[in-house]
């Protein structure tokens, strides 16, 4: 009688242990089906944002229950437009973009809720090597800058003023070229003396022999809330369980 009880108990244990992997698999599959779909529009695709790409590749967002689609906007103005229009739930751009949208009377303000970078990630590139470069060397020179009012341009002008240069009087800053085209313009047209570039464009210019990195804007500007995640107020109110996982 005792032997029969032990046999029954052993059989029950075996069945329970065997069922565990299947239960776990079913739970995992069920969890995968319930991932919340989120479109994230980033201002640029650069090694500067490596932590974000690592999180995506390592599955950290999926672990948080998010099915993330990454789209590159190529400029804060375009990323902001994507968020306001609903093409993207989350925007990743300079904090200044949400301020501008608010000042323009946005009925559903876009709010910054998390910061990824705390320094500028771009570099000043010259046509020639300048091992003893000083910001004063930009006086009376032409520089390919960024969009007026954008974080890259504002930080650049802050550094100029910090070093005794008036951005409007002491040099010429060309702001007519699209964000993603300045490196090509610098390489193809030698009328400018310097350009401000993110990676990988800065390194590409060096490899091409068309330019040389002479200064880091991140080092010379200091700490600044350079790039942040943001979303519309209505989305943040309705989808708190989602954006808090970003």
Language model regions located:
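Short, glycine-/small- and polar/acidic-enriched structural segments
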Residues: 28-178, 185, 193-200, 210-217, ...
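Residue-level recognition of alpha-helix termini/interfacial anchor residues
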Residues: 3, 138-141, 238-239
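Short, low-complexity disordered leader/linker segments with a strong preference
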Residues: 1-37
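Short helix- or helix-capping micro-motifs
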Residues: 205
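Extended ligand-binding regions for polar small-molecule ligands
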Residues: 15, 58-62, 226-246
């Amino acid at each position: 009688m005792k032997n029969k009880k032990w046999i029954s108990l052993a059989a029950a244990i075996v069945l329970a242990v065997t069922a565990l992997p299947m239960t776990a698999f079913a739970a995992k599959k069920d969890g995968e089906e319930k991932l919340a779909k989120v479109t994230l529009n980033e201002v640029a695709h650069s090694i500067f944002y490596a932590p974000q790409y690592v999180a995506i590749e390592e599955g950290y967002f999926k672990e948080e229950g998010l099915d993330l689609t990454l789209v590159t906007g190529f400029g804060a103005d375009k990323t902001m437009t994507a968020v306001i229009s609903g093409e993207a739930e989350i925007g990743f751009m300079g904090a200044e973009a949400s301020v501008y949208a608010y000042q323009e009377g946005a009925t559903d303000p876009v709010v910054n809720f998390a910061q990824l970078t705390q320094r500028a990630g771009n570099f000043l590139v010259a046509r020639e090597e300048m091992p003893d470069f000083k910001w004063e060397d930009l006086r009376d020179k032409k520089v390919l800058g960024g969009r007026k009012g954008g974080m890259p341009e504002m930080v650049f002008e802050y550094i100029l003023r910090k070093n005794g240069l008036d951005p409007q009087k002491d040099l010429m800053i060309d702001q007519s070229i699209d964000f993603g085209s300045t490196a090509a313009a610098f390489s193809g047209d030698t009328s400018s003396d310097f350009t401000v570039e993110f990676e990988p464009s800065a390194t590409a210019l060096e490899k091409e022999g068309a330019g040389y990195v002479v200064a880091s804007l991140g080092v010379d500007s200091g700490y600044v809330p350079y790039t942040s995640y943001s979303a519309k107020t209505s989305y943040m109110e309705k989808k708190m369980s989602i954006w808090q996982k970003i």
